[in-house]
């Protein structure tokens, strides 16, 4: 496979600079404040991402690392040449890649979800998702050697815990501008509030029956007005979510919930994939997804 390019990535040439090299991605910063993420794995696809395939990624990663290497601090010309080589390799990978746009499939799933015609279908989906979340988190605790089955919220400094972020998140629920107030809120390169909103919009689009990008129009407008409050990674994630293009792991969650042939094991697999995304990004997005299914006032504890 020649690779994949997100549907919101404009064709090169880009007036971009290398912004960072991470364990699973190389980031390009565009003049408009958005990031193009060159991802190591196909599962990391997003609206503004490029997956070049394993061999091309290795070349891009090596060139980008050379461009940022401390060993080249005394040779800025060599570092600049390495960065230019990385960008050239990324542009070549874009040219070879196939478009990735999940919106047609998400629209089918949204219509199918609505056509199921059951009152309370979102709540039933939430029950299935909570059960899958319990199974996935129990399996994760077992892998990490936790035998007591506790969730460890006492030491959890995420938006679910009882630390500063968790307490602030609970307080924000009482605000008139919630959940738009979550833009840029919380820990992470992509702030936790942005992940939560991406999950929320994804589920709202699913349950609307109209497909991606239509639900919660007022909230979407509020988010647009607040994009300058978050990081480049957060803006990029939310730009995709606003356009109805959630990250691939959320697309898999929709597929597992709305595809009639998908069973509980497939849903657990999708949840496990989500939980593996970032330090807490996937879990934060699942929280937002559940909140859209249940209503903002409902608890999202698994």
Please provide the spans of the model-predicted regions:
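Conserved phosphate/anionic-ligand binding catalytic regions in large, soluble enzymes, centered on
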Residues: 189-203, 281-292
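Long, charge-rich alpha-helical interaction segments
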Residues: 221-225
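Phosphate/adenylate-binding glycine loop and adjacent helical scaffold
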Residues: 1-146, 152-169, 188-193, 236, ...
